[in-house]
Amino acid sequence: LLGGMALEAVLLARAAPGFVGNRLQFAVLREALHIVHSGIASAEVVDQVMRASLGRRYAMVGPLEAADMTGLPTVADIAHHLFPELATGDEMMALVEQRLQRGDTGQRSGRGFYLWDDARRERIQRRRAHQLRFALKP
């Protein structure tokens, strides 16, 4: 069943809070919030970069495969310079907390980082349906 949906079961070496997928997703989310909170880029730009580059790349190869393909010396050099600049705390959660205090809970309330009007919902629904059809093609 999983294979027919382009999903794969995995065997973990040990249990960890949050599962591997959620941990990776929230590492990306933490940095995305940090980028917006720090004024480096808007939410729109962060999402555009993810959709147009990283999202496509990670649909084909995982982060460690990508590191091998890039070359570990290059990865080590970039990491040496970039890691000190990445988010480590939780100060960027202020962006989420401010929205929650206003009652902006995301798609359900109609506002979060974006205004969730019918046009946005329909656009994303079409995009997701297209991607799902493509992923399920034999």
Per-segment meaning from a language model:
Residues 22-24, 119-120:
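Short secondary-structure transition/capping segments
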Residues 1-2, 32, 82:
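Hydrophobic alpha-helical packing residues
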Residues 6-14, 38, 43-138:
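NAD(P)-dependent Rossmann-like dehydrogenase/reductase catalytic/cofactor-binding core
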Residues 1-23:
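Rossmann-fold dinucleotide-binding core
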Residues 25-31:
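Structural/interface elements that position substrates and couple domains in central-metabolism enzymes
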Residues 33-37:
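Regular secondary-structure segments
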